[in-house]
């Protein structure tokens, strides 16, 4: 019988997959064993998808992730979000020289941060195991960081193994990283305010699972996008449902705080105003288990101008009066490609967008923000450099 050579997709970039590819390509598989070839191809595709998901950061949306439920029914808005360039820095497959270079930069970041009470970080990769997120964060000079506690592009997951938990706690002991400075990001598949019963149930169970995983890791906060009406219900109904989702998770967890993220007001999304977040908080039964994360790009695009000291103080005063400073648990640090009030959720490097450096200098010198996780979600490639820029803005 004729032999058949195994073929591979050319777009497979993962070092791990390339290594497996090199081992398997020379194999000759008989036609009668076609099932083996299919199994190999399926395994390779699964590995590729898992690695892509582990290295995807907030805002790095892809077609499989975006649904009408979790963003909006507005095709133009969905297109904007699909094209976001933000990705977490990849560290898998790096050479020893690259690793040393990365760690050297991390040391410089920590030196620059000396004397500052601000806790800067970014969304880090957990490729290779959740504990790698801690090692990566420490290596690059993070004082705080965001991550995904599971593959955020699929609904179904295996339970978290004891080995995963043990490896995580080993990394915590070795790095002494403060667990209250880790703010995992919820899956984009979820819509905590969905008007459709089936999607709502799946979202609630997914959020509960992610929060229970976070608690096993000693993490105290969980950040998520509030939700969307998807054009099928009134905002008040959607916000009430979001509060009920929070209550559902709180009742089945011990102490994790569910942190609502401010949104840009795009499409049918909830969270574009401080008043909407306040409405949700007022409906939540246990107030100590809910909080807010201010995203600088989102509030700016939503109409909150923070570019001058006067404007900044007015916005912060408004937040304190409407929501309350006691609910502020984290900040996402991003410049904006869109202008104030544009409702365009597109992040930009610090000082290179429409917000400008002045606003971030005000943030870095605001005593009310000391000790709060401040997480960069700017486009990939400059996180350590941007953290040093930010720390140098702290003049206190």
From Swiss-Prot:
Q: Is Zinc one of the keywords?
A: yes
Cofactor(s) needed: Zn(2+)
Q: Which InterPro entries match?
A: AP_endonuc_2, AP_endonuc_F2_Zn_BS, Xyl_isomerase-like_sf, Xyl_isomerase-like_TIM-brl
Domain of life per record: Eukaryota
Q: What is its EC number?
A: 3.1.21.-
What does the sequence similarity comment in the record state about its family? Belongs to the AP endonuclease 2 family.
What is the name listed in the Swiss-Prot or TrEMBL entry for this protein? Apurinic-apyrimidinic endonuclease
